[in-house]
């Protein structure tokens, strides 16, 4: 069997609990690949990972390799081929006696975490390592981590697949179609309520989703906020943020990056901008992407963006620029 080293932060969290068995079962990296898994947590809860490791052993997957629990980011990411940065400080938590409510505070406190993680990954992970940021605010966390890694050979992504999957599900339901018939979904911009889950270039059975649904008022006034704000009703209903669906989206992203994209389709993730579509360079921005299955990821070019789309993309671009400004002292 081939072997791959995979590091996961936030290993004792709810997302990881749904994610980890699927990483070592053969589903994500293939049945011919043994997965050496490194689970990383803060010192206060790292002991809980021993129970998770016992459960992974008890699953009995042939593809499960070595299992390590650590509170040391350097030990965790050493020689990693994939690093999934799931852990982050959520809004509402109390740090040093202060409740973290403002997005600017959230950006800065997570910025410190992703500074350390980026430095360790840049120095110790595989030279061609792939890094997926799941922990929010994901785009700017990825910007900080990538900047601090100082290793341009490594590939950084922020996850927008959860938004893309939510968008596909809503479009399919409205059209009375199978979700598998919804293709070419792009979530432009930030993983936040300013995101633009593009219904004009998404297709249902090969036809523009907007044309297929034929209800422009629903598309622009109901569909968009439904997808953009989906996280809140999930929290309200279950008393916690999305976990299983977020884990599923992380797996979808890893598979989309590692495998060749189907001809004519694309997938959605946030990557460093190369200036495409007028997005400022190096901003971690949600784009339509293709993979050649050999590590080369390209931004799809030539997609038509109408005035409505361009206005929405400007809003999310401006938000990301303001986030970048808020953490500029961490980007030096």
Q: Which sequence ranges carry the predicted segments?
A:
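Conserved N-terminal Rossmann-fold NAD(P) cofactor-binding segment
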Residues: 25-80, 89, 95-96, 325-329
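C-terminal substrate-binding/catalytic lobe of Rossmann-fold NAD(P)-dependent dehydrogenases
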Residues: 148-154, 164-332
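N-terminal Rossmann NAD(P)H-binding glycine-rich loop of SDR-like oxidoreductase domains
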Residues: 8-12, 20
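Rossmann-like NAD(P)(H) cofactor-binding subdomain of soluble oxidoreductases
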Residues: 98-170
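Redox-cofactor binding/interface segments in oxidoreductases and associated redox assembly factors
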Residues: 83-85, 133
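Residues forming the Rossmann-fold NAD(P)(H) cofactor-binding site
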Residues: 17
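Short glycine-rich anion-binding loops that position phosphate/pyrophosphate groups of nucleotides
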Residues: 88-91, 137-138
């Amino acid at each position: 069997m081939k072997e791959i080293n995979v590091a996961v932060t936030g290993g004792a969290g709810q997302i990881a609990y749904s994610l980890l068995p699927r990483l070592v079962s053969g589903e994500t990296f293939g049945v011919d690949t043994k997965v050496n898994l490194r689970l990383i947590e803060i010192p206060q809860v790292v002991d809980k990972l021993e129970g998770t490791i016992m459960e992974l052993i008890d699953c009995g997957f042939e593809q499960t390799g070595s299992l390590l629990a650590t509170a040391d980011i350097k030990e965790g990411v050493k020689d990693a081929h994939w690093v999934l940065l799931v852990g982050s400080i959520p809004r509402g938590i109390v740090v040093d006696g202060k409740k973290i409510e403002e997005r600017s505070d959230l950006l800065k406190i997570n910025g410190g975490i992703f500074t350390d993680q980026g430095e360790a990954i840049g120095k110790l992970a595989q030279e061609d390592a792939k890094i997926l940021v799941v922990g929010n605010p994901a785009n700017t966390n990825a910007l900080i981590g990538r900047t601090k890694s100082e290793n341009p050979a490594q590939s950084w992504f922020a996850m927008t697949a959860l938004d893309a999957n939510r968008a596909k599900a809503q479009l399919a339901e409205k059209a009375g179609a199978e979700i598998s018939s919804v293709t070419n979904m792009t979530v432009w911009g930030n993983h936040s309520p300013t995101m633009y889950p593009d219904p004009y270039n998404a297709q249902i059975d090969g036809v523009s989703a907007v044309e297929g649904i034929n209800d422009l008022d629903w598309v622009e006034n109901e569909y968009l906020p439904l997808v953009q704000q989906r996280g809140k009703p999930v929290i309200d209903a279950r008393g916690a943020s999305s976990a299983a669906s977020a884990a599923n989206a992380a797996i979808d992203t890893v598979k989309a990056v590692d495998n060749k994209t189907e001809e004519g389709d694309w997938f959605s993730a946030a990557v460093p901008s190369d200036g495409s579509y007028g997005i400022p360079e190096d901003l971690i921005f949600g784009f339509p992407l293709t993979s050649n299955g050999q590590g080369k990821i390209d931004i799809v070019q030539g997609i038509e963006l109408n005035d409505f789309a361009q206005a929405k993309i400007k809003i999310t671009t401006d938000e990301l620029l303001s986030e970048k400004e808020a953490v500029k002292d961490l980007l030096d």
